[in-house]
Amino acid sequence: MKIRIGHGFDVHKFGAARPLILCGVEVPYETGLIAHSDGDVVLHAISDAILGALALGDIGKHFPDTDTAYKGADSRVLLRHCYALARAKGFVLGNLDVTIIAQAPKMAPHIEAMRQILAADLTSELDDINVKATTTEQLGFTGRKEGIAVEAVVLMTRKHD
């Protein structure tokens, strides 16, 4: 069995007059995130982790913000595309661990819905998907409620024939 680990990180700033979408879930908050796509910072970090595990670059390479085709793009579609690239190379998700770093809004009420969506989009068992959230104790840009940061780690496996 071949095993690959990928790490993804992304940050987006609050300020867009649109819904806050995280893992495909609309999270009630006063503002959304500024981005070329729908701004789903969690799915961007996960997509980067998958691409990184397979040495396929990053989401900026695959979905450049200079391409109008991705203006307002649904990040779930982008994530499924990244996972399809992994599947085409014979890899499947072993597990996913995500940390959402935000002072606000509170994520706890939305974590299970996020896990359900990720399990469906990554054709994985719910037990293979972990999403957690933390604050920075009011320190830094996330502590000042200026934006959200996310770290994602994936383990990808391929069985040899």
Swiss-Prot record:
GO terms for molecular function: 2-C-methyl-D-erythritol 2,4-cyclodiphosphate synthase activity; metal ion binding. Keywords: Isoprene biosynthesis, Lyase, Metal-binding. Transmembrane segments: none annotated. A divalent metal cation binds at D10, H12, H44. Its cofactor is a divalent metal cation. InterPro entries: MECDP_synthase (IPR003526), MECDP_synthase_CS (IPR020555), MECDP_synthase_sf (IPR036571). Pfam families: YgbB (PF02542). PROSITE patterns: ISPF. Pathway: Isoprenoid biosynthesis; isopentenyl diphosphate biosynthesis via DXP pathway; isopentenyl diphosphate from 1-deoxy-D-xylulose 5-phosphate: step 4/6. It catalyses: 4-CDP-2-C-methyl-D-erythritol 2-phosphate = 2-C-methyl-D-erythritol 2,4-cyclic diphosphate + CMP. The record marks H36, T135 as: Transition state stabilizer. 4-CDP-2-C-methyl-D-erythritol 2-phosphate binds at residues 10-12, 36-37, 58-60, 63-67, 102-108, 134-137, 141, 144. Its EC number is 4.6.1.12. Involved in the biosynthesis of isopentenyl diphosphate (IPP) and dimethylallyl diphosphate (DMAPP), two major building blocks of isoprenoid compounds. Catalyzes the conversion of 4-diphosphocytidyl-2-C-methyl-D-erythritol 2-phosphate (CDP-ME2P) to 2-C-methyl-D-erythritol 2,4-cyclodiphosphate (ME-CPP) with a corresponding release of cytidine 5-monophosphate (CMP). Homotrimer. Belongs to the IspF family. This is 2-C-methyl-D-erythritol 2,4-cyclodiphosphate synthase. It comes from Shewanella baltica (strain OS155 / ATCC BAA-1091). The lineage of its organism: Bacteria, Pseudomonadati, Pseudomonadota, Gammaproteobacteria, Alteromonadales.
